[in-house]
Amino acid sequence: MTSKKRRQRGSRTHGGGTHKNRRGAGHRGGRGRAGRDKHEQHNYEPIGKHGFKRPPGAERTVAEISVQELDEGAALFVAEETAEFDDGAYHIDARDIADDADSSDITKVLGDGQVRQELHVIADAFSDTARTLIEDAGGSATLTEQGKSIAVGEDEEPNSNDEN
């Protein structure tokens, strides 16, 4: 096989087009990022800020605990004095039990698993499944004051003006 250099012997420009094309950067439209806003074509705007950054004050961290963890650990929680057993039912505050509840803003009970005993649970938020499982077993799911204010805030529509 012959080399490219050998094949192009006798050719004046060696595949570079006309004699003007390989002189300077003019054939390429300038050097580097020259012409980025004028004569260069691009599929995106590479200059400036893009997107949205959520304000840190609007972010909430959520500590999650499942109803199965509450159900299976109810007797242990009573032994550790983080819950109470009264009239055949366990009274549990999920904020005292969730692993990362101290460092989070909200404690939420999720509906993963089964509930076999009567639980009266206090938490900032409940999933619909968790609330149903707890109440079907004869217990109750009670929101904290913080949880009630969060629930009211989610039900309201933002920027609702009824004056028009």
From Swiss-Prot:
Residues 1-59, 137-164 are annotated as: Disordered. GO terms for molecular function: rRNA binding; structural constituent of ribosome. GO terms for cellular component: large ribosomal subunit. The keyword Lipid biosynthesis does not apply. Pfam families: Ribosomal_L27A. Residues 153-164 have a biased composition (Acidic residues). GO terms for biological process: translation. It comes from the Archaea. Residues 1-33 have a biased composition (Basic residues). Residues 34-43 have a biased composition (Basic and acidic residues). Keywords: Ribonucleoprotein, Ribosomal protein, RNA-binding, rRNA-binding. Coiled coil: none annotated. Binds to the 23S rRNA. Part of the 50S ribosomal subunit. This is Large ribosomal subunit protein uL15. The gene is rpl15.
